[in-house]
């Protein structure tokens, strides 16, 4: 009987150590985990370029958030909404998408270099940087002036 309990306890310890005990186990304090990545909302007003630079300085291949699915859209929206402090600049939050003019052909990719596999535009406009809009509960992408300062979310 004692040996059976010991073996069962040992298996439980191995299972818990392999499965982890919390959602944020691999993320730094203050960061949130989702499908192998860590996310953090920053209540700092920065231009798109400065926000991207700030995210790269966070380490571990950090960039402005890239959104690859509806599931990730919902995760980011639910992370942003309660964590943005209300100011006049909280109507938009930068994401890592910017249209770049390469040889007069407009191409877009995430700031981490990954391709766009999922799209959630409000409407196409000529402005080159994208963000999430509060009016859509931070679930739709909107074109914004890259030089305006907004809050942002980093992903590592």
UniProtKB/Swiss-Prot annotation:
Residues 1-23 form the signal peptide. It is found in: Secreted. This is Snaclec A6. GO terms for cellular component: extracellular region. Interferes with one step of hemostasis (modulation of platelet aggregation, or coagulation cascade, for example). The lineage of its organism: Eukaryota, Metazoa, Chordata, Craniata, Vertebrata. Belongs to the snaclec family. Heterodimer; disulfide-linked.
């Amino acid at each position: 009987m004692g040996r059976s309990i010991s073996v069962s306890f040992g298996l439980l310890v191995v299972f818990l150590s392999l499965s982890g005990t919390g959602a944020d186990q691999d993320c730094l304090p203050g960061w949130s985990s989702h499908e192998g990545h860590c996310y953090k909302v920053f209540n700092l007003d920065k231009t798109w370029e400065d926000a991207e630079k700030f995210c790269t300085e966070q380490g571990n291949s950090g960039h402005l958030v890239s959104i690859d699915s509806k599931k990730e859209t919902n995760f980011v929206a639910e992370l942003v909404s309660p964590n943005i402090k209300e100011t006049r600049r909280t109507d938009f939050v930068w994401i890592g998408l910017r249209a770049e003019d390469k040889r007069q052909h407009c191409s877009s990719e995430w700031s981490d270099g990954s391709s766009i596999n999922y799209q959630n535009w409000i409407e196409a406009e000529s402005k080159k940087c994208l963000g999430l809009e509060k009016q859509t509960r931070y679930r739709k992408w909107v074109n914004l002036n890259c030089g305006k300062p907004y809050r942002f979310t980093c992903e590592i």
